[in-house]
Amino acid sequence: MNKIQNLNPQCIWKNFYALTQVPRPSGHLEKIQQYLLDFGKQAGVYAVKDPAGNIHFRKPATPGMENRKGVILQAHMDMVPQKTPESTHNFETDPIEPWIDGEWVKAKGTTLGADNGLGVAAIMAIMEDKTLKHGPIDALITRDEETGMFGANELPEGELQGDILMNLDSEHWGKFVIGSAGGIDVTATLDYQEADTDADDAAVKVTVKNLRGGHSGLEINEGRGNANKLLVQVVRELIAETEARLASWDGGNMRNAIPFKAEAVLTLPKENIAALKEIVADWQTTFNDEFKLIEPQGIEVIVEEVATPAKEVPVEIQDNLVDAIFACHDGVIRYIPAYPSVVETSSNLAIINIGEGKASIKILARSSREDMKDYVVTMLESCFSMAGMKVETAGAYGGWDPNPDSEILHLLLKEYKELFGKDGIIQVDHAGLECSVILGKYPWLDVVSLGPTMKSPHTTTERALIETVAPFWELLKKTLEDIPVK
């Protein structure tokens, strides 16, 4: 038995470990869907896959508690697939390798999937525990939350039964989330006719790497380096000073993760390679001085001589693209005026792919205000349309408006104080949660989000704080037992 399965409470950790052994990257969920269906049937609860690909459990009330308000427990089954450069992990076929490092559970070379595997594991523990006392419980485990909340957006109306929604996708133990930001995906694209490379030119690959990355909602306010935004500074100077020409660009791979690596292939006269290397070395020094408190592990900016490609980006298009990337806002745009420590609006320059006659730039914009979300979209449209790019939006979801008078919130705060002797914290998150989407279909629900502590989700340093899982479980059980009558 893996040591993780012996952690307290075993009912959650054994289920979480089992989830790590089933591949479940966003977009490839057939194995985890079948696993959850089989689990539900073995647990003796109602278990179906709905037309959207979500898994729906239903557990009847403990005898005598049928008159309690119905609770819907909710989490998402998919995980962000990120791995270290040296990792050979295949997320579609290989199990995650979790391990215990002191007070944390981590993964070897990949994301851990505690976001949102611990929430799913808690739901599984509720479903299979015959000793718990509770009213009627529905559970919704959604598909593809990380890539656009597709399961929640396609949730059939009328599928769920309940009065209260408890989302288990928050990542700060002791904080109870009652609101979150909305978001929208913005994609700029351009098709272009490639130019021939000068046959006498050399080529180099310039890479910015070893950044921390992170969650583009929860950690956007920390000032972490964005590999695309750092690389564009380097590339812009190399074009100006060494006659370099852009052949290709690849940076970032997840819309909701701060990119930790980006690389560009450049062509240039052979006699300018030495000057290029000096400029790149200077940028590495500059970046490490600028980010020394935020990226203490050390940012790497490296040059590798590569085979000269046959084609490159035409000069005018290259200049337009580089200028647009340079001008594109990244990071926090505004904080909530009434809560100056809470981010209201942000954008994440997430993914850039340029080469073979195509350019694609993807940004995730977030805001707790619809008018500010629209403002960011217009700003990005202006930025990239000036470069001749076509700008489209998709995957829009609204924010979740806080309800400080929520009955389930105040029950949780009461139980938390009685169990642990301290006050819980009410919070509004800048991250997107499925609560807003589900509320759009079930507007009468009383909603709250909670969970154990996790750090650096969406990165290869993702980790779960072991000591917070047991109290999370105790609070969940006690709250379900004390849900009021209808």
Where are these regions (language model features)?
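Acidic, glycine-rich active-site loops and adjacent beta-strand->loop/helix elements
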Residues: M77-M79, L140-G148, S170-W173, R212, ...
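His/Asp/Glu-rich mid-to-C-terminal helical/loop segments that flank catalytic regions of hydrolases
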Residues: G158, R224-E241, L268-I273, D319-F326, ...
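Acidic/His- and Gly-rich active-site-bordering loop/insert found
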Residues: K3-E103
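Zn-dependent metallopeptidase/amidohydrolase metal-coordination segment
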Residues: P9-I12, P337, E344-A359, L364, ...
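Active-site metal-coordination/substrate-binding segment of hydrolases
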Residues: M65-D163, A203, V315, F326, ...
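Substrate-recognition/cap regions that form aromatic- and gly/pro-loop-enriched pockets
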Residues: V342-A431
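Midchain, well-structured core segments that form catalytic/ion-binding scaffolds
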Residues: E103-K106, E146-T147, N153-A365
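Active-site-adjacent substrate-binding region
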Residues: E219, N226-N228, V232-W249, P402-L445
